[in-house]
Amino acid sequence: MYRDGKMLGDGLPMNFVLNHGALGDVICSLPAVIAGRKADPFSIIRVWGPSWQHELLEHLLKPYGEFEIRNFEDFPKTKAEREERNLGHTALNQMPFNTHTRNRVHMVDYAFGCLLDARPEGLLERSYPTKAPLGPRRFDEPYVVFPVGSTSENKLFRASVMAPIIKWVNEQGYVPVLVGTKTSHTKAEAGGVLTPITIIDEVDRLPPSLRIECVDLREKTTLLELRDLLGHADAVVGVDGGTLHLAGTTDANIIYAMGATIPQHRFIARNGDPSYKIRYVGPRDLECTGCQSKWRMSRHDFRFCAYKDSACMGLLHPDDFINGLKELGL
């Protein structure tokens, strides 16, 4: 409150434009959106997100107040158009020419800076939105979800790493469930043209004797159905990517592997606790581990390994995943 017990502001609507629209980036932007609603409970707040995430955004934000969810594709791109439509204020969740991909800044903090010109006040404000309910359970059997897709080699869950984990999970009586897609809705510039990012995985390299034990749900779920699947799972096991961030909007156990970054800059906080029902896994004995988190300049694209071998993914050790699952009660 300010003078005379009144809020400071002009009463115009606020437009949060999530043009940095990859699933993980959008989810990491939601704590800032929620903080904006809490700071100003009266103004209209519009959230412009990718159309393929519209239903998910409505569902995740509903417990936190009133928001108008709009499709980013319909957002007026010029200032003249926005003024003509009297849209109000606008903030984007991305800085221009963002090839540094948030090196030493947590993605939630980055979104706070872009959308609110502020930083979060502690871990509770940094926490993912977890209040939205889950839909019905898909399987009666206990199961563990493996997000298998990656947008780059240095985030690829390699078959050599995955296979022993799947084998152990199956031996403990859990059904391994594979999720993912082949083509991302996210686009990146290639040769001056925005094109969809291709998703890669190594499922075909898993031994046939293991593949037959898995339920393959790749390409078979909507985002909300995927969230339900993650939330009801006994655990979600994977490498840094959008599906793990989606799991972070539920109460699921998570094993979160990373190579180019470190937990300090990529942790998932729930209810103010970055260690809640989660274990972080990194490569063993690799000097360049956390390369992105060590880099202090902009303009290097860490989707691509500087050494061109993405060694960090091959040096993830299955035992570290399995020990994490044991610690989480599996």
Language model features: what each stretch is:
Residues M1-L330:
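Catalytic machinery of carbohydrate-active enzymes
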